Every structure is written in C-alpha cells, then in structure tokens.
Swiss-Prot record:
PROSITE patterns: HSP70_1 (PS00297), HSP70_2 (PS00329), HSP70_3 (PS01036). Residues 612-641 are annotated as: Disordered. Belongs to the heat shock protein 70 family. The modification Phosphoserine is found at residue 362. Keywords: ATP-binding, Nucleotide-binding, Phosphoprotein, Stress response. One of its GO terms (cellular component) is cytosol. SUPFAM superfamilies: Actin-like ATPase domain, Heat shock protein 70kD (HSP70), C-terminal subdomain, Heat shock protein 70kD (HSP70), peptide-binding domain. GO terms for biological process: chaperone cofactor-dependent protein refolding; protein folding; protein refolding. Residues 625-634 have a biased composition (Gly residues). NCBIfam families: PRK00290.1 (NF001413). It comes from Drosophila melanogaster. One of its GO terms (molecular function) is ATP binding. It comes from the Eukaryota. This is Heat shock 70 kDa protein cognate 1.
Length: 641
C-alpha cells in the first residue's frame, strides 16, 4: 500500500478542520455529514460516544455529558482565573486533580472523567477518520495547529493529545502562520510584502506580522489573547437575554442547564445573522417553565454588549506592530482569518486602525489554517512538488523565557519574538559561600519579577563542590525546538555535572504512563463505538426484515396467494418481533441476530414457496440477499438448521 500523505489539522476551540496536499494542491476534506468543518464536541450517552456534528446536535438534550471548549482547558491549571470564570458557563462538571482540570461525565450509566488532552484527542481522532475515509487508508502523520500565543504547557498538551489519538505529530505550528501560508502560497515570485494576519476564532485571538518574499515566510512579531473569541460574544448575548427573561417573566433560567443551552444555540445563530443583517429574532418555544421566549436583537445592541471586547482586539495589533518595528503604513496586506472576523464592527475597527485601508478577505476564514497546515505537512513529509519545494517557514516564540535569580528577579534568556528554533546560553553563579546546589526555576512572561510570570518548571543541580560565592560557574542553556517547546540544561563547569529538563510534570504535563494509559483507553472507546455501530446495524436489519414481511402481506399481487395459516404465522411473528424490538432497543448485536435467524427460519420458506408458486424471483432481504440468508452491509449470519 503506498504511503499516505500527511494531513494538516486545525484543532479549533469550537470547530476543527482537516486538509491534505495532493497532486500539487490542497483539498479541505468534508466529514461524513458533508461539512468541511466539524464541531469540537464530544458527547457521552447511555449507549454510545458521539463526536462532531452528532455530539453538537444533541447537546440541548444532554448538556451535562456533552464536552466542548477543551481547548480552553488544555495546558492550564485548575486554579487559572480563566478556567474558573469559564466554569460558570459550562454545563459539564470540571474538577481538580493534582491541580489539573478534569471533566466528569456519565457514560453507559458509569461516571467517567477525562483530561482535556483526552477530549482533544477524540476530536483529533474524528479528524483523522475524516481524512482516512477520503484517502482510503491509514493516516498517521499530521501537522497540528495552535494559537500563536499558546504557551509552552498548552503546546506540549496539544502534542500529547495527538499522541493519544495515535498520530505522529510532525510539527505544532501557529495558526496565523498557517493562514499566512494559505494566503501567500500563490504569491511566490512577488516582491517582499509585509502581511498582518488578524485571526479571531471561536475561543482564541492572534495577530501576527510577517514578511513574505520568494516563498520565505518570516514572522516578525506575534501578539494575542488565548481566551478571546466568538464564545465570549455568545456569552454576552446569553447574559443579556437571561436578564431580559427575568425582567419580562420574573423567572431566573440561569440555573437551568438545558434552557441555557437552547438559549446559547439561538444566540450563536443570532450572532451569525447579525453579520449580514441589522436585526435578528430569537424564537424559543417553552424555554423555561412552559414560557415561550420571543425576542429580537439589533446589530447596534450586539455591538454595544461586546464593545469592550471588540475594541480590545486593537491593542494586540498595536503591540505586534511595535514589536515588529513597523508602522501602520508599512503593512501591505491585512488578512482576516477565523469565523469571528465576519463581524462588521470588528472589520470596521480594524480598517479604521489602518486609516481606512482595504482588508483582504481573499481566503476562507474557516479553512485557511487547515490549508496552511496541510502545506506544511506535505513539506515535512518530503513532498517535492513545485508549489511547495521552496517554501520556508520562520516562526517566533510568543513569550520571553528566563530563570529566577536572587530576589525573585526574572532574568530573560530568550526574548519574545525570537525566531525559532533557537538556543541561548548564559553563565550564572552561586550567591552564598559553599552553596551545595542551585535550584533552576524556569518562567515565561514579560514582567520583571518571576511571581508575576508563568512558572514552567524547576529542577535542581546538586553536588556543587564547596567554594566561595561567585566562584562556581553554572551554564544554563535554553533550547527551543521548531514546535516552540522548550528544553533547559544546566551544567556545572568545574565538575562537568549536568542536569536537564524538558519542561514536564511540574507544569501539569501528562507523564509517559498517563499517555500510554490514555492511548489504550482511546482504543477501548474506539472498539466500543464499533460494537455500537454493529449493534445498530443488526437492529436495523431485523427491523427492516420485519417491515419487508409486512409489505409482502400487503402486496396486491401476492396477498391472495397466502394460505390463511401462513398469513397468520407471518403476521403474528413479525408483530411479536417488532414488539420485542420496541421493548429491547438496547439489546446486544447477538440477540438481534438470533431473533432474525428465528424469524427467517419460520418465514423464509413461506415467502420462497409463495414466489416460486407465482413464478417470480424472491425479493432481497434487509441485508441485500435472498430471504433465508442475510448479508450485505451488516454482519453475516449463517443459517442454522
């Protein structure tokens, strides 16, 4: 079997997308529902696990056990302020385990809990299966995207999610950079262009300034907010309508998860409508305690409710330009990416910021990131086609990285917006006489004191020979790989003693054992999903066979040929089986198959006799073969005498 190409996956907060570069062009792959983007939702029910459209479609009926927004949890600690505020909006339960958030749901009557990485891995698995259905084989290699402003922990956790999904993650790349590839791929050979990518999605916001020339994409600066997007605009609308409902009907629906979910779905739809119309209506029958909720919202009201959030998107734009040492006039193209850039007010603010300059809407904002990721996947997989062979990506690290020195001071080794991969070394020493060891504490952030920055991890370099303060020399090396993930090494020069850390468990990273366990769990869930599919198939075949028998009884050409006894037998047996089906919807596959065998053993000879007497060929059964043997798409069943 030929080696399948690597795919590019945009793992989004609200929607995900997968693309593949083949025959010199990118194909964005539609899922089994025909949609080119798939909701990043996973649901658990009494009988099955659902991922994507199927999960989102049943969310109002099953809010407690439908997980979304895993990207807002991944790589964060439970006590993170954003996690605490998000929990107020989520209908599912989030609890702390070793300082990390876990999500608890009920599946097949049992309580199960998942780390955000596991939930994201389920979405990645769905994207992988979407690609496999299109490519006709097993996909193992992928490039996965993250917001440019994701920190080290979030990147590492995303890579772990890929591993749990059974993917070999070739590279983690930044979303705006991927979008820039989608924008600039067909512009090779043109003179140098400065491009600003404005990427406002469902849950995250990034701004990147790049220079594109002759296939070289060089990121100059990046800025953003890993917790701002369409979901936040929905939240404002939901809160607004909860208050309106309280005012009008004197009822507080704030604690009713199902009502809130139905309201949120309506708000999301209204928000989209307001991008093309100036008014949207909301009509929800029996929203809460039997009260119908009919109302409307104008675009002006929506803009007022979210005014501070919309205006807040301009600060990262200014910051990225400052860091890139460019002024507004030097930007040639302003490219919009992410579904939330369809909001007219956001476009107006951005255009005003650039003194009326036209915005570039030439790329599909929902698909651009997966498109660029697919191109990068092809390059890393060794694709030699002309379109990509000269393409080079130079990205940057979004946050400054350093260590804590005496007095809790942040000493930066790698400044933000440094091109990656990169390596920096600095010599440190002891601050006390005969100090036996040093504690290397690693932080990321821009503040002067480490307490105000984000701790990534720490490790000890011990057994330093006794010496006066200032004499021992400890060489600390920071090494950032192409994924933006950090390795730190400390070396004591006189003894050659070395210690290193790929920032791991201190910052809530999953251990190797955790990941292996989750890979096994993922396989178990996949098998359970498959068994469920087989079960449904067997049930449908049995149901279909029963109704086929009934339609034969009603067939005007055949009904007169039945003897009363045969008619009675078929009528009785098919009715009994349908009644059994209604009462045993959750029976096992084998039970459905056994029932069908029993029914066929009695009814097939009657039907065959009837058709032979009429000189006609017997009809195909539910499975697609003659009565008396099932087959086709379902499980094969051998007739037993």
């Amino acid at each position: 079997m030929p080696k399948l190409p690597a795919v590019g996956i945009d793992l989004g907060t609200t929607y995900s997308c997968v693309g593949v570069f083949q025959h010199g062009k990118v194909e964005i792959i539609a899922n089994d529902q025909g949609n080119r983007t798939t909701p990043s939702y996973v649901a658990f029910t009494e009988s099955e696990r659902l991922i994507g459209d199927a999960a989102k479609n049943q969310v109002a009926m099953n809010p407690n056990n439908t997980i979304f927004d895993a990207k807002r949890l991944i790589g964060r600690r439970f006590d993170d302020a954003t996690v605490q505020s998000d929990m107020k909006h989520w209908p599912f339960e989030v609890f702390a385990e070793n300082g990390k958030p876990r999500i608890r749901v009920e599946y097949k009557g049992e309580r199960k809990s998942f780390y955000p990485e596991e939930v994201s891995s389920m979405v990645l698995t769905k994207m992988r299966e979407t690609a496999e259905a299109y490519l006709g084989g097993t996909v193992t290699d992928a490039v996965v995207t993250v917001p440019a402003y994701f920190n080290d922990s979030q990147r590492q956790a995303t890579k772990d999610a890929g591993a749990i999904a059974g993917l070999n993650v070739l590279r983690i790349i930044n979303e705006p950079t991927a979008a820039a590839i989608a924008y600039g791929l067909d512009k090779q050979g043109t003179s140098e262009r400065n491009v600003l990518i404005f990427d406002l999605g469902g849950g995250t916001f990034d701004v990147s300034v790049l220079t594109i020339e002759d296939g070289i994409f060089e990121v100059k600066a990046t800025a953003g907010d890993t917790h701002l997007g369409g979901e936040d605009f929905d939240n404002r609308l939901v809160n607004h309508f909860v208050q309106e409902f309280q005012r009008k009907h004197k009822k507080d629906l704030g604690q009713n998860k199902r009502a809130l979910r139905r309201l949120r779905t309506a708000c999301e739809r209204a928000k989209r409508t307001l991008s093309s119309s100036t008014q949207a209506s909301i009509e929800i029958d029996s929203l809460f305690e039997g009260v119908d909720f009919y109302t409307s919202v104008t675009r002006a009201r929506f803009e007022e409710l979210n005014g501070d959030l919309f205006r807040g998107t301009m600060e990262p734009v200014a910051k990225a330009l400052r860091d890139a040492k460019m002024d507004k006039g030097q930007i040639h193209d302003i490219v919009l990416v992410g579904g939330s850039t369809r909001i007219p007010k956001v476009q107006r603010l951005l255009q005003d910021f650039f003194n009326g300059k036209e915005l570039n809407k030439s790329i599909n904002p929902d698909e651009a990131v997966a498109y660029g990721a697919a191109v990068q996947a092809a390059i890393l997989h060794g694709d030699k086609s002309e379109a990509v062979q000269d393409l080079l990506l130079l990205d940057v690290t979004p946050l400054s990285l350093g260590i804590e020195t005496a007095g809790g001071v942040m000493t930066t080794l790698i400044k933000r917006n440094t091109t990656i991969p990169t390596k920096q070394t600095q010599i440190f020493t002891t601050y006390a006489d005969n100090q036996p060891g040093v504690l290397i504490q690693v932080f990321e952030g821009e503040r002067a004191m480490t307490r105000d920055n984000n701790s990534l991890g720490k490790f000890e370099l011990s057994a330093i020979p006794p010496a006066p303060r200032g004499v021992p020399q400890v060489e600390v090396t920071f090494d950032i790989d192409a994924n933006g993930i950090l390795n730190v090494t400390a070396l004591e020069k006189s003894t050659g003693k070395e210690n290193r850390i790929t920032i791991t468990n201190d910052k809530g990273r999953l251990s190797k054992e955790d990941i292996e366990r989750m890979v096994n769990d993922a396989e178990a869930y996949r098998q359970a999903d498959e068994q469920q599919r087989d079960r449904i198939n067997a049930k449908n075949q049995l149901e279909s066979y029963c109704f086929q028998l009934r339609s034969t009884l009603d067939d005007e050409h055949l009904s007169s040929r039945f003897s009363p006894a045969d008619r009675e037998t078929i009528q009785q047996r098919s009715s009994e089986t349908i009644a059994w089906l209604d009462a045993n919807q959750l029976a096992e596959r084998q039970e459905f198959e056994h029932k069908q065998q029993e029914l066929e053993r009695i009814c097939s000879p009657i039907i065959t006799r009837l058709y032979q007497g009429a000189g006609m060929a017997p009809p195909p059964t539910a499975g697609g073969s003659n009565p008396g043997a099932t087959g086709g798409s379902g499980p094969t069943i051998e007739e037993v005498d």
